Amino acid sequence: MRFLRAAFILSLVVLLYPASLPAEEPVIVDLTQTPCTIVEAEEHPREFVSTNSRECVRINRETAGERTFKVLRLKPGRTIFRVTNRNVPYPLGFWVRGKGLGRVTLPSVSGGGLDEGKTRDYVIDLKPGVYLYSCPLNPTPDYPLIVEGK
């Protein structure tokens, strides 16, 4: 009798354990890089012209006070940042990292090799916290990302 009771309880645990449930589909965030900017992150995207990253450093410095950014808000979990290089004539990349001390404690993803006209996926398992995302090769400003909820 004890054996049957133990087997029944074990069966319930196996059936009801959350890990046995199908994993949620990842969230896909589509982003478009144009010279000196990530379009979806800007309140009022502008069409800058740049043939190299040095020009973007100058453009970003000169326009810093005029530009406002949208806060990207996501829930924790597997996230795919699908990034497209639109009309930037040099290879780009993408970088998500924690802000401040979060840079040490939160997950990060980065990569390069994003040529003009190409799209690349950057996959990360986001945890709650405050992040920044940008392209250091374009370069773009650091855009805010807040991950909260369940």
Where are these regions (language model features)?
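Sec/Tat signal peptide C-region and signal peptidase I cleavage site
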Residues: 19-23
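N-terminal post-signal-peptidase region of extra-cytosolic proteins
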Residues: 59-71, 76, 81, 107, ...
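Positively charged n-region of N-terminal signal peptides that target proteins for export
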Residues: 1-5
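Extracellular/periplasmic metallocenter environments
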Residues: 24-31, 35-53, 63-66, 89, ...
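Contiguous segments within soluble domain cores/interaction surfaces
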Residues: 72-105
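Bacterial N-terminal signal peptides
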Residues: 7-17
